């Protein structure tokens, strides 16, 4: 499993270094005069229950089908339970989905194809796939933008950019609290929260939240 490298300040240098080195089928039902056809939700919602509060994500299955399907596989398998936000840079992003509290990296599924050329942008509260310098290296790790990071959008400096596949629709205040936590170096890792911010569970909502 690979992770995005977010170096230290200055801010622009950090972004440029990052850039150097981040379908569900339609259900078929029997004909019935009373039962409408089942149509897959084009925008699944996922709740990340964290140690600092809940974050609800709306995923764009139409514009980022591979990334959404990949993320949902990790969600439905329980992969994210007990993982942490292991890299937090206020003004830039909060990254998670790959390490446990002991900073042990979890084994992942195979990497997926980059979908950054989908028109979605790395704006504040959007969620995107983390990766290395290889554009097609994204696995389980993701990041939530806490600033408008246009340098990460397609085509970026490497001709690809970082794939946005959804956005936060509830719990923005939780994201804001996470981005402000104290951080320190831990072994080879930088910008690690001093007190672990744990993803206690990740679940797909059966229906969209009433108020977004």
What are these regions (language model features)?
Residues 2-19, 23-212:
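Cyclophilin-like peptidyl-prolyl cis-trans isomerases
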């Amino acid at each position: 499993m690979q992770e995005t490298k977010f170096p230290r300040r200055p801010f622009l240098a950090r972004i440029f270094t990052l850039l150097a080195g981040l379908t569900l089928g339609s259900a078929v039902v029997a004909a019935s005069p009373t039962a409408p056809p089942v149509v897959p939700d084009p925008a699944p919602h996922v709740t990340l229950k964290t140690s600092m509060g809940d974050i609800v994500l709306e995923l764009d299955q139409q514009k980022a089908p591979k990334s959404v399907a990949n993320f949902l596989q990790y969600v439905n398998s329980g992969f994210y339970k007990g993982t942490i936000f292991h890299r937090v840079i206020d003004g830039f992003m909060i990254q998670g989905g790959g390490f446990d509290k002991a900073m042990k990296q979890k084994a992942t599924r195979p990497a997926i194809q980059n979908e950054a050329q989908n028109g979605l942008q790395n704006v504040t509260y959007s969620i995107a796939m983390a990766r290395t310098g290889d554009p097609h290296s994204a696995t389980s790790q993701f990041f939530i933008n806490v600033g408008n990071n246009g340098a990460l959008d397609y085509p970026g400096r490497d001709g690809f950019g970082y794939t946005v596949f959804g956005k936060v629709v509830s719990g923005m205040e939780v994201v804001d609290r996470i981005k402000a936590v104290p951080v320190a170096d831990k072994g080879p890792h930088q910008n690690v929260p001093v007190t672990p911010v744990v993803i206690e569970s990740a679940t797909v909502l059966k229906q969209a939240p009433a108020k977004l």
